[in-house]
Amino acid sequence: MKLSFITQAISSNSDQSSSIFKFNSISALSLIAAACILTPTAHADDKVVAGYFADWQYLNKDYPYTVDDIPADKLSHIIYAFLSMCGPHSGAGEPVQKQIKQQCADKEPYTAIIVDKEAALEVDFGDVNVDVAYKGHFAQLAQLKADNQNIKILPSFGGWTMSEPFHAMAKDPKAIAHFSKTAVELIQKYDFFDGIDLDWEYPGGGGLTTSPWNPDTKLTDEQKALEREAFTLLVKTIRSDLDALSKTTQRDYELSTAVGVGAKAAQIDWNAASPYLTNMFAMTYDFLGGWGTQTGHTTNLHATERSWWGMGADVFINQMIEQGIPNEKLVIGAAFYGRGWQGTKDFAGELPKGDLVSEQGAQFGTGENGYFMFWDLMNNYSSKQGYEYKYDEQAQAPYLWNPDKKVFISFEDQRSIKAKAEWAKKSDLGGIFTWELSGDPS
């Protein structure tokens, strides 16, 4: 994509709120736009433009995504999703549980592990010039690092389906120490990594195996307090081990964490934890989804009087700052996907209100019901298929509406991401990141 076209897209004042559904490439426009808005160069030290890389997306039959597809020259950080540790993973699918069992056969509990070793180390994605004893994504990342010295590459531990062992580990300081030690040893072995990212969903509960709505999984106040202290101990311990590694390698290492919004963020003692962290990635998406009938924007920048429960990225970000996260370390999240519903009631395509509901989440999507990758929306949900493109300027949020099928899809596009980047700059945030890069492979 030519830079002149990018510049034109950034500065364009054309009306994008019409029902004519015209997508531009998010990764080609918006992340570059974010880099242009937030910082004069893609790899400036002061601002983050990051993307999560999902290690399983190379298997996508429609749009396989590999390291070679990453726009490395436009990013400051690549975050590899996901690694884990030996421990309970009851929420993970059977194939993942099998992988973890294999990797942990000869390891102590809470040892840091590569879950999908085939993808990371064995699949042949092509020749590399770097001298490494492995293939897979890791070889490609080692080459990418050699070609882009200023970029930061971090492995992320946890994720929605693999956060259960964090809760078990939190009960034992020795387990925390062991995980930290082995995680740091892992990045020392695969030395293209520049630190560690944590995606514990969530300290204090609210994740897949700690739902507050289920009396069998809801954490007690005592357990929440323990995990609050454990998270601080965890980041303090990892920071200490990374600093020790720095003395050996003469390199600086980053430590970051993903942050849930609302009550989930409030469960962490940020005044105690944030000094040990380089960046905190605010998951300002999935405000709503097909798991409920409430319908509306899922990743809107601004809360409005029409927002369900007053939700908006700006509200959540400001809450995090009030809770002790330094604004310059806080990175706002953007989604390369959408969430959808069907049977939307009493709606004709106007701006969604805070009482909008549907019969259920969409019973179709990209690989899972109600979830739509951006490339899928771009290719299969246009005006040709009866979808009208709408834009809520007050919320800075696009959405699709199919009046015949009564389908509502909330998503992110270049306009809304540009708005987030501009707001992040105005608010002196640390930057912007996306989950996840393969959503727009163009």
Task: Indicate residue ranges for each PLM-predicted region.
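Extracellular low-complexity, Gly/Ser/Thr-rich intrinsically disordered linkers
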Residues: Y58, L377-S442
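Short, well-ordered coil/turn segments that N-cap beta-strands
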Residues: K47, L75-S76, Q149-I153, F192-D194, ...
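Gram-negative bacterial Sec-dependent N-terminal signal peptides
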Residues: M1-H43
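An active-site-proximal structural segment forming one wall of the substrate-binding cleft
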Residues: K171-D197, L234-D241, A265-Y276
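Conserved, mostly hydrophobic/aromatic
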Residues: I78, P155, L198, I238, ...
